């Protein structure tokens, strides 16, 4: 091996000499750049392996007039290298220096005009893993990173190419990039050395680099901590094994922007906030501040009664005519185009904000005067009109203005005075409204961090290659209200955590919602929380729980679940679980029976009518029947007068198949806007009364199940290849609930859809982002404000010839029901749940001991003794359900491996 390595390095040196190449060595890597500007080689000197791809790429390039000009020649001129870029008329001088651990490429001078971008360095690399945030490609053996040495360097990955660019709008001359090419186990050590050598941000917590600190491994509770509830919240946090409590921005302050202390929650003002943090510190807990980077609330003093001039505008024009204080139409001298987040537009004229519902060219129509607490007043022709940039219903600070610094001073000042230990920069991605996101996303984050005088655990959304340095870890996105387990595996771990892993940034698996029962989602249950806890242990990742004190108190199983989470957290931090066991826990579902002992477990839910029979599959050995059985609402039959008609096709409505260019899954085939009158529908749908009465948003809170009558024609398909139609409810805030119909039948059929199919959304039908965001179908949903029914294809076999027509869609009325003396039987035994259970109540039994009966929020109603229950044999089992009176239940069979 040593002989082969020596020959490889010698051959590289010979080739370099022949081609008049320039060779740059660190202790572990050798970069060779040809005199024609091509990056010819990057070798791992420890084993002689080439790290560049076979196709040759110039080591640098410029963009001018939209065209890329690769470096075409490089020559040494004293201590510098002079680089020419083809026929661009541009050249540049570089200083390239090598140290034991890294190379530094510095742009010392640019000759020529019209430069739009200079790629200080670019390498087409072979390692498989791509960290596009940090500009690093890596595998288990070797890592290659182009790390900018200032905020003005844009490191990124495009396909296989790692590059670092500078732009004239920020700064070019004097900018530097470090090439870190090292064995992967040494990568973070070298990064820390680069941070020290070039005085880059390199925060520590308790003297340890923040990313490797104990704090970065600990979990936190994200909740509404106040003066009044501090003791209770601390108790819950300690119960769950949390080391931090993160306070919502809306809890500690009243509005975004100037962030006044919320006197309702902290009657003693800033002193009260400090006293709560001091109390947490005394209890061994640290406290984090949640804020929303650069957003300014419409109720904030920076907006009302007089808007700050530093609010960001995304378009400006001038008033074409005089207007008085009552006119609701403005005529501008020129049109502004459409705002990024659509109509309506908020515009500021002098010191008045007008909320204009429509625009027509240069006209602003249906304007509400004196909006957001400003005063309506007359304005003269020629007055400047500025359209206020909006994101998520709030305004933004112009990060080029003094307002940005004022906000940063406010936040850092509060941190320093009251003793926060953590900051969560939420909404950072919205700062792309100011300009290129790679730069502007991190600007205010850095201002705040730089002015804070405390060790801070930094997290947030919207990370850049530069703010990577101050972030201690990442967060794996918001919580899902439904399909919690699938959301964790298919999104949080597969997408978000993979992103952070690829970029060498630790991650925690939050946020997980800790919820109480509402019409759109059930209360959080112990098996959902244990699913998170198991993955937390498997991946050695912290978790954050997002909730509020009301939900913690409402969920009757909070104590049980938090104690379980705390036990898992202690086990994880102890390092007692062997790596081989943790690797097993990363897949499937598991249950801890005692500390450190885990068994595979399945929770298989299905609806069942009482009286009736269902089949249960036990994939493990023989065992006692374990179950959760919940009373569901009784559904009216299709055609019942209490049902709500959503769609009636006269004649049946053809659901057109996807076109050749349509992107799947989730392409929209038809849409019914329920809030519009029949005559305003842009389709052949007949919705509601045939007289064309005005439509309205529907309250389906008690009509959440759907019935659809379909006519399906075409060749039969295998069930795995069958077409799947999505009857999607849309709420007024563009959130959704997906109801899937597998078109495995032919002919006419009425299909009942008792609940959404959220568990299939990510596992089978992740929608194309151009159709709709999957998050909008799994987050909270307002059944009380349903505005549309969308028909979407989630799967459609190409050239299948399938035709589908819809004749009727109804939302079925729900009626409360009650069950008494529920019996579950197999051939060998019967178990009885004595007493009554009403809609939403559920009974849970784990094969021995007592049966516990809970309300929908997990509040224990009673505990009843259980007789010897049925046994499940390995394989298929028939279970019979009986009770006093008919009803529908959801039975969850719980099976475990011994």
Label every model-predicted segment.
Residues 667, 673-777, 802, 810, ...:
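Extracellular ligand-binding interfaces
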Residues 112-114, 633-638, 698-700, 711-721, ...:
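Extended, low-complexity, turn-rich repeat/linker tracts enriched in Gly/Pro/Ser/Thr and Asp/Glu
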